[in-house]
Amino acid sequence: SFIKEISMKTETIAAIASAMTNSGIGIIRISGEDAFDVIDKIYRPKKGNKLLSQCKSHTIHYGHIYDEDEIIDEVMVLLMRAPNSYTREDTVEIDCHGGTLVMRRILEVVLKNGARPAEPGEFTKRAFLNGRIDLSQAESVMDVISSKNDFALKSSMQQLNGALTGKIKEIRGKIIHEIAFIESALDDPEHISIDGYGENLLIIIEKLMQKMNQMIASSENGSLLKEGINTVIVGKPNAGKSSLLNALVGRERAIVTDIAGTTRDVLEEQINLNGITLNIMDTAGIRSTEDVVEKIGVDKALSLVDKADFIIYVVDTSTALDEND
């Protein structure tokens, strides 16, 4: 497994880095020790005949991608030499027209000339293995991409820029400092006294525990921001739950009638409220019922209430409260 890991790391990889949909621009990325050899085989400049492997790092070049003598597309090519790239490897980025067929054809040519298809997340994996980012930063890359609101994006960017890493390093540094003091005292008890040190150590440990608990709480809050707050609308039948859902999403998502028990299954929608994502679920009206289908809906509603982050309880003020409330 270790030998396979080393082998995979030295191979040159390639993938389509932009969305696989028709758009103005597409991006194909190549990374590895043979990246410049691969691009030399398939790229010809618009003017001159200088090989890209002879060009400086962080330069952009205009020309065409060829499959032998056939022009595939007109492109811009960005060169990044190791270690000054995302993966800390030689990296080539081909900016082409954004048609899905064009991107696939260019990738096929790249693979035919010495690269292999990248595995999902392999560029970020290499950035981690090569020491460009740590584990928390590697995790935050996908969080940035999948951010559903401004708060999640800000939190992910802070983590990507090393905010979490800095806090962990600070705690680790203090622990190492105390361990070093204890070891020194054990090695040289005549000159280093640990009288009364136990009480001070407990105070230090308590403070570090407080910091770690704050980080854990912050992580849990961050998860809510990233994934969205699961919000369940509950109440008796005909209390106005579906009308509230429609008002929140700004369209008629749920059927609204005067007949009680119209909503049988769970209706889910997602809205952004002042930068916070709410995963809203409209549920069946909660009441005692002999209807088999409606009872399944009521059971689902009660199950969602137990798992909800936030509950909106809807009451019809025109009627008196009863046992179903």
What spans do the regions from the language model cover?
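Glycine-rich, N-terminal phosphate-binding loop of Rossmann-like dinucleotide-binding domains
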Residues: 98, 248, 283, 315-318
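Conserved G1/Walker A P-loop phosphate-binding module
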Residues: 42, 188-295, 300-305
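Residue-level signature of catalytic and energy-coupling elements of molecular machines
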Residues: 28, 94, 182, 212, ...
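Switch/connector loops and helix/strand junctions flanking conserved nucleotide-binding motifs
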Residues: 36-38, 103-104, 287-290, 320-323
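A glycine-rich (often HGG/GG-containing) alpha/beta subdomain
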Residues: 2-154, 158, 162
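Conserved C-terminal guanine-recognition region of P-loop GTPase G domains, centered on the G4
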Residues: 299-325
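Long, non-coiled-coil amphipathic alpha-helical linker/lever segments
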Residues: 132-211
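Short flexible coil/turn linkers enriched for glycine and charged/polar residues
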Residues: 21-22, 68-72, 84-89, 135-136, ...
